[in-house]
Structure formats: structure tokens, C-alpha cells
Amino acid sequence: MKKLILVTGGNGRFARVLKEKNKDLNLYFASKKECNILKLSSLEKIIKKIKPQIILHCAGLSRPMNVHEKNISKSIDLNIIGTANLVKIAKKNNLKLIYFSTGYVYAGTKGHYSE
């Protein structure tokens, strides 16, 4: 039986592409309403409901830096606090966590990056 993968940001851009392209994975796309990453109780509820083995974290803001700077508290909440909550839940429930990000973590400068 395939492992169940909880996808946060289930209505976002990346999730839409994943829905279209996926043929082999057992994915559960959770909406913000169903899986609010800012609330540990919401995360506990969805974990208990669907019992995933993996969390694919695609929720968050992925806009140019000038948009983030206009609403820095929302950016911090979603991209830092929400991710920290998922790390806590994954650790508590012994789940694997895969985190997706964008090139905007590099201050929006263009170019090729290496880490």
C-alpha cells in the first residue's frame, strides 16, 4: 500500500500542478480551511483524521520581496511560524516532512544558486 502524503497548501499553484501531473502518489490535498498551519490544533486534527506518513509542505507566501515587505507579519506567520508548527507536528507524530520553497528566499535576486 502506498504511503499517504498530506499536501499543505492544497489549493495553491504548486498543488494544482501536482494534481494534474500526479499519477502514482497517494496524495491528500488539504485546503487552508481544513489544515491551518498556524494552529497546532488544526494540524493535530488533520493528522488524526487522515493518518499520513509524509507531509509535503507547500503552504506559504511565494511572492516577490516587495509584496512580503508590505505585509511582513503575514509573511513571517505563514513562512516561519507555520513551518515551525509543521516541524513540531511531524516530530511528535514521527512523520517525514518535505519542505518546498522558492527562489524568493534569496531576496528575489536573479541568478543561479548553490547551497
Give residue ranges: language-model regions.
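Glycine/Thr-rich phosphate-binding loops of Rossmann-like dinucleotide-binding domains
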Residues: 15, 37, 64-66, 107-108
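NAD(P)H-binding glycine-rich loop region in Rossmannoid oxidoreductase-like domains
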Residues: 40-78
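Adenosine-cofactor binding site in Rossmann-like domains, unifying the SAM/SAH pocket
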Residues: 23-45
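Short, well-ordered alpha-helices that flank and scaffold nucleotide-derived cofactor binding pockets
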Residues: 16, 20-24, 45-48, 84, ...
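N-terminal Rossmann NAD(P)H-binding glycine-rich loop of SDR-like oxidoreductase domains
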Residues: 2-23
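SDR active-site strand-loop-helix element
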Residues: 8, 30, 55-59, 97-103, ...
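Conserved internal alpha-helix in NAD(P)-dependent oxidoreductase domains
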Residues: 73, 77-84, 92
